[in-house]
Every structure is written in C-alpha cells, then in structure tokens.
C-alpha cells in the first residue's frame, strides 16, 4: 500500500511538472522606440524585457558568434538589389545601455548573404563560412580582424536563377549549420512554388566535409528550409510550405531531420498532425507514398514563414529550458495575422502549434517588424534580428 501511495505521489508530481511546463507564458508589454520615432509595444514573458541593441541596418538576417566572442550578422540590403549585401561585426556591447557601440562592415558587395558560421578545426585554425545565393565560401579567420586577411575559398556552387524575382527567382537564400560530427549542412530552396525540379540540389539539405569535399544529399523534399540548427547530435530545420493550397494549408513546419528522409514536397504536405497528397502532383499517390513522410516536430499555421530557430538547454525559471524559440517571419498577406512573432516549442514536441513567446510586430494591421533569427547569449538572454525595421533586439531578464 505504501509503495502504491509513493507511485501515485510521484506520478502526480511528474504530472504537475509537465502541466507547469506546458502552460503558455503570460506576456506583458514593453515599450520600444526606434531612432526614426516609431514607438510600439513588444510583448514578452513578464520576467523578460527588451531593448534595441543595434539599428539603422537594412535586411538584417542571421547571426553567429566568432571564436573571439564577437557577434557577426548578415544584411541582404533589400529585395530590389541583391548585390549590396554586407556582413557586419557587432562589437563593444554596452551592458548598461544594452547596445553595441560599434557596427563594423566586415564584407561588402555580396549577393544575398543570408547565413554565416564559424568553426575551429582540429589543428586550432579558425574558419569563417558564408552562404551566398550562388556560392558557399570559406575564409581563414584571424581573431580580432575587422576585414578578412585571407582569400575566399569556393566550397560549392548553387543555381542562381528562378521563376519569380527579377534578380534570381524563388528562394535566394542558403543557410549553413555545422555539426559536432565535423560536417557542414546547407539548405537550398526550390526554384518555384510547386513544381517537379530539374536539378537535384533544389529543395534539399546537402551534407559535406568542412572543406567542401564529399557532398551528398542529406534530406530531400524541403521546399524552403531557411532555418537550420545543430543541437547536440541532431540537425533541426524550419520549412515553408507551398502557397497554392489556400489560406489554411499547408502547415509551415519544423523538423528534427532524419538522414535520407524525403519530406514530401511537392507531392505531399502536412496540415495539422497529418500528411496529405497534393492533388495537383500526386492525386493517386502514384509519385510518392505520403505515409512515408515524417511528421513535423512543430506544425505552424499556414504561411507563418518560420525562419531562425534556437535551442535553450537551460533556463533560470524553466520557461526556456528544453525548448526551441522559432522566429515566425509572417505572411505577406497581413489580413491572415499569421506569424510576426516568436514562439516556443518543446524539443521533443510532435506537430506542436507553438506557444506565443514574443509578440507585437504586427498590431492592428501595422507591421513594426518581421523576426528572422535568434541567437542565445545566456540561459534567458538572446538577440533577435528584424529584417523589416533593420533592427537587432536584445531580450534579457529584468
């Protein structure tokens, strides 16, 4: 009897922990005023606040911390001219004012610089990786430098065209992640909204050695996996679904990537917690068995546009420990009110919709910003890029 009571008590205790962790955080307003005079409120869990760490940028995108502790960030400039991209160094962070005192151009004149990464090899040499639309580059990195001291090495080339935009078409971005297995992963989006591609590299994640050798397909059927993050021994990715199935379908998704898996595009798509056939390409299942498509860890509302993701292995008050934060860039159709926020996802979730963690970028039809990437600085502290306002926010405990 005593053993039974102990078991019941333990079960109740564990249940309370699970329930406590699953309660969505209560969000409180924080007033933000930008240099141009725009003033609005961003909503965060009540124990956090936000400040402007850097502003005056353009299409500021993805971040990485260098081996010497500085923050590097990409800036794609704008949608009309994709040849003026820049990589900046954010330096001399003022902890009192929560701002970077220096924003230094590191590389300029780049074609859609979206993603960067650093790696220190087994010989102690530091390397800087840069993903452009048409090329993956690597530079020997010297700590403390403000300009590259070495020539770029071209590790891979990619298609540089598409069916939509004037300067290269659909899905111009390439995103990098480096694993603890000393492999590099890079995502290449589709050339179209929905089609059967002529080039195998499209809608894939490619794995290669850190010097570019031994390239192979790691995963397929990912229409536009803009966010990549290696966590411990696994690769995670966000993915944007197609636009031709209406306002309610398909779900935008986040996956723990399985080596060799096909995630369905253009033949299958996820909506809610189920995978369906795209009737325009796979009406009878003749092209692909959609039952073989892995279910997502997170299934966001259609057209939310998930981009960057970051994992928090610990948190001072358990609101972030064991969770991802995912930046939902937002639908271009504002009336849908999809995205324009940061959401929280448990690491082992199954088709989770996400819990609101940071909101206020879309307010009564007015867009104040579009979240892109999240970089963890400390257990409850992170930087967030916004490519609409050209701002980098610092979020931290009060």
Where would I find each of the regions flagged by the language model?
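Beta-propeller domains
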Residues: 72-99, 144
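Beta-propeller domain segments
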Residues: 21-46, 173, 190-193, 203, ...
């Amino acid at each position: 009897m005593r053993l039974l009571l102990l078991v019941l008590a333990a079960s109740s205790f564990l249940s309370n922990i699970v329930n406590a962790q699953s309660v969505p955080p209560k969000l409180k307003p924080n007033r933000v005023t930008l240099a141009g005079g725009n003033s609005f409120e961003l909503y965060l869990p009540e124990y956090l606040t936000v400040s402007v760490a850097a502003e005056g940028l353009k299409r500021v995108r993805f971040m990485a911390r260098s081996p010497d502790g500085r923050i590097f960030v990409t800036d794609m400039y704008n949608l009309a001219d994709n040849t003026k991209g820049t990589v900046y160094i954010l330096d001399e962070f003022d902890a009192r004012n929560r701002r970077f005192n220096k924003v230094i151009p590191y590389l300029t004149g780049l074609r859609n610089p979206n993603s960067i990464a650093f790696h220190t090899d087994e010989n102690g040499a530091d390397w800087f990786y840069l993903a452009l639309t048409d090329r993956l580059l690597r530079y020997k990195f010297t700590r403390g430098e403000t300009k590259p001291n070495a020539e770029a090495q071209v590790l891979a080339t990619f298609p540089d065209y598409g069916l939509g935009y004037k300067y290269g078409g659909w899905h111009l971005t390439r995103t990098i992640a480096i694993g603890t297995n000393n492999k590099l992963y890079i995502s290449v989006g589709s050339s179209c909204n929905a089609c059967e591609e002529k080039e195998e590299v499209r809608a894939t994640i490619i794995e290669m050695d850190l010097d570019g050798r031994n390239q192979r397909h790691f995963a397929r059927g990912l229409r536009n996996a803009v966010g990549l993050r290696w966590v411990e021994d696994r690769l995670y990715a966000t993915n944007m679904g197609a636009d031709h199935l209406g306002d309610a379908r398909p779900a935008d998704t986040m996956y723990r990537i399985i080596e060799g898996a096909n995630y369905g595009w253009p033949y299958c798509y996820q909506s809610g917690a189920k995978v369906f056939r795209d009737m325009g390409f796979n009406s009878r299942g003749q092209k692909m068995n959609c039952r073989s498509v892995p279910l997502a860890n997170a299934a966001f509302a259609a057209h939310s546009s998930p981009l960057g993701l970051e994992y928090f292995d610990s948190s001072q008050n358990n609101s972030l420990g064991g969770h991802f934060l995912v930046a939902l860039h937002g639908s271009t159709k504002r009336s849908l009110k999809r995205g324009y926020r940061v959401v929280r996802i448990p690491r082992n979730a199954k088709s989770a919709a996400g819990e609101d963690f940071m909101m206020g970028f879309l307010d009564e039809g007015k867009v104040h910003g579009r979240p892109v990437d999240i970089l963890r600085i400390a257990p409850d502290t992170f930087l967030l890029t916004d490519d609409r306002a050209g701002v980098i926010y610092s979020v931290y405990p009060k």
